[in-house]
């Protein structure tokens, strides 16, 4: 059991969880406001 807790506290797992949460937030934001993420240069 302590091997599982040691695995869950490693950096790659935390980075993947953070990236998953960030991607989910961006996807939901882009679904409700699709034109705010990509501004035209003109």
UniProtKB/Swiss-Prot annotation:
Annotated compartments: Cellular thylakoid membrane
GO cellular component: photosystem I; plasma membrane-derived thylakoid membrane
Signal peptide interval: none
UniProt KW Phosphoprotein keyword: no
Pfam families named among the record's database cross-references: PSI_PsaJ (PF01701)
Keyword Thylakoid: yes
InterPro entries: PSI_PsaJ (IPR002615), PSI_PsaJ_sf (IPR036062)
Main location: membrane
Keyword terms, alphabetized: Membrane, Photosynthesis, Photosystem I, Thylakoid, Transmembrane, Transmembrane helix
Membrane topology annotation: Single-pass membrane protein
Record GO biological process: photosynthesis
Annotated SUPFAM superfamilies: Subunit IX of photosystem I reaction centre, PsaJ
Bilayer-spanning residue ranges: 7-27
Origin superkingdom: Bacteria
Family, as annotated: Belongs to the PsaJ family.
Purpose: May help in the organization of the PsaE and PsaF subunits.
Protein name in UniProt: Photosystem I reaction center subunit IX
Protein encoded by which gene: psaJ
């Amino acid at each position: 059991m302590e091997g599982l807790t040691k695995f869950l506290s490693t950096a790659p797992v935390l980075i993947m969880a953070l990236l998953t949460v960030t991607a989910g937030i961006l996807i939901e934001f882009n679904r409700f406001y699709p034109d705010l993420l990509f501004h035209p240069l003109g």
